[in-house]
Amino acid sequence: DEDDSIRAMILMGNGSAFCAGADLNWMKRMASFSEKQNFNDAMGLGRMMYTLYHMRKPTIARVHGPAFAGGTGLVAACDIAVGTPDAVFALTESKLGLSPATVSPYVIRAMGERAAHRYFLTGERFDAAEAYRLGLLTELCQPEELDHEINAMLGHVIAGGKEALRQIKTLIRDVADRRIDEALVRDTSQRIASIRASREGREGVSAFLEKREPAWMRTVK
């Protein structure tokens, strides 16, 4: 996240699945863990999910095949998720006598509380079309078009200013679900005032008026 030469991150699985869920060897070890050991183990996943969700750079999930349990959480924690019709999702923890606690903040934000009630409680699998309908997937395309769609999305993303993208991600997290009142009006007005007066903001507006590319686009040629 600190490397300025990296403009965005694409999260993808290696093989026929995006993420097939928990490793069986880990599950065997976990079965004998104490509550403290389980807490420490869960915090590892929790911190990873938190880091992904709070990355300052845009994140895009490239989803094909199964994305089960934590895999569904990884998709939800990304800013954008592009998937193919063979993508399938499930939060099956209840069938193991467990709950999807660690991934719940991200999944609920991505697909909504009502849908979370259904899929957390039933553990049902749901397909890519349903994930797209719920908003867990932001784009759905055929497998042969997946890389093209990802690259097109990436092109749109990196056309934005680096600092603008960072501030937009923070803006969405801070503004979502907030009451629209005088405090919010002042907050958002200050945000736009600050970025308009910034070096990047001035460069972007100047480039638009002068009908040229902004300086930040030179680094992606």
Predicted feature residues:
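Glycine- (often His-adjacent) and acidic-residue-rich active-site loop
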Residues: 5, 13-51, 67, 179
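Glycine-rich beta-to-alpha active-site loop
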Residues: 49-98, 125
